[in-house]
A protein has these predicted regions:
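A glycine-/small-residue-rich N-terminal strand-loop-strand element
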Residues: 1-19
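NAD(P)H dinucleotide-binding glycine-rich loop of Rossmann-like/cofactor-binding domains
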Residues: 13-76
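NAD(P)H cofactor-binding loop motif with strongest signal on the N-terminal glycine-rich segment
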Residues: 76-77, 145
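Hydrophobic/small residue at the entry helix of a nucleotide-binding pocket
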Residues: 81
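Adenosine-nucleotide cofactor-binding segment
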Residues: 90-152, 200-202
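Glycine-rich phosphate-binding loop and adjacent beta-alpha segment
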Residues: 100-103, 148-219, 253
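C-terminal hydrophobic helical "lid"/dimerization subdomain
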Residues: 201-253
Length: 253
């Protein structure tokens, strides 16, 4: 611990999110990016949840305030972010619809809080959303897919709904005419990132504490379904790219 650091000491259990360089057994980084881990959060949970869980925290609580009665569409609902988002949104009282790529992933998403699932490879997800909501459509779409789900995601939104693009697993969304948002119902569209939401120390701590609270209470469980040795990092990436994983993937030194 460097000179001038007053809120951390040698032996404290800490976690962080943001600074690159995590594929290592030891590293050096600024103390203001570290947060203390509560005793009821394991290292494995922390590794599997800090980036994904903090992302879900701001998506559901700040980008769009999800609450009782909100109708939410989560793309890739069986992925690392998706499983946390489904649980947390359900906990907040929302109706959760998730798109998935297989029946096994549909079952997994439902076990983790999704009320309805859509097999996007076999079904028209826009038509299914209209059917599930009896034409009311969704208040917000959380999209980490990108190119493959746009602009169809806009057709899942009610007038004045929110399209939240937080990732681009299938590629970047192409440039589009902003008037499309007006034509689809005076929609809002945003491309948020965790770095901006957690840029201030007080926000980082507040967001972390919110995450620790829902995980510590059991309201949200962190599915670390895939653990790899640090030396096998390349294989973990290949499995991710091959869509062979669900939930969080962690590397163990």
């Amino acid at each position: 611990v460097g000179p001038g650091v007053t809120d951390l000491k040698v032996g404290d259990r800490v976690a962080y999110v943001g600074p690159l360089g995590g594929y290592a057994a030891e590293r050096v980084f600024n103390a203001d990016r570290a947060v203390k881990l509560p005793d009821n959060i394991s290292y494995e949970q922390a590794a599997g949840m800090m980036l994904k869980g903090m992302t879900v925290q701001y998506l559901l609580n700040r980008t769009f305030k999800v609450g009782k009665g909100t109708i939410v569409l989560v793309h890739a609902a069986a992925g690392g972010v998706g499983l946390i988002a489904c649980q947390w949104a359900n906990h907040l009282g929302a109706t959760v619809i998730g798109t998935v790529g297989s029946k096994d992933k549909a079952d997994l998403a439902k076990k983790n809080g999704a009320h309805h699932t859509i097999l996007y490879r076999d079904e028209d997800f826009v038509a299914k959303v209209k059917e599930i909501t009896s034409g009311k459509l969704c208040d917000v779409v959380y999209d980490g897919i990108g190119k493959d789900t746009f602009p169809a995601s806009l057709d899942c939104l009610r007038p004045l709904g929110y399209f939240v693009s937080f990732g681009s697993a299938s590629g970047q969304i192409a440039a589009f005419n902003i008037n499309l948002l007006q034509a689809k119902g005076s929609l809002f569209a945003t491309r948020p990132t965790l770095n901006h939401y957690a840029a201030k120390r007080e926000d980082l701590v507040s967001m972390s504490n919110d995450l620790f609270k829902v995980v510590g209470s059991g309201a949200v469980k962190i599915p670390t379904n895939h653990s790899y040795a640090l030396k096998d990092a390349a294989r973990s990436h290949a499995d991710l790219e091959g869509r062979k994983t669900t939930g969080s993937v962690i590397l163990v030194p």
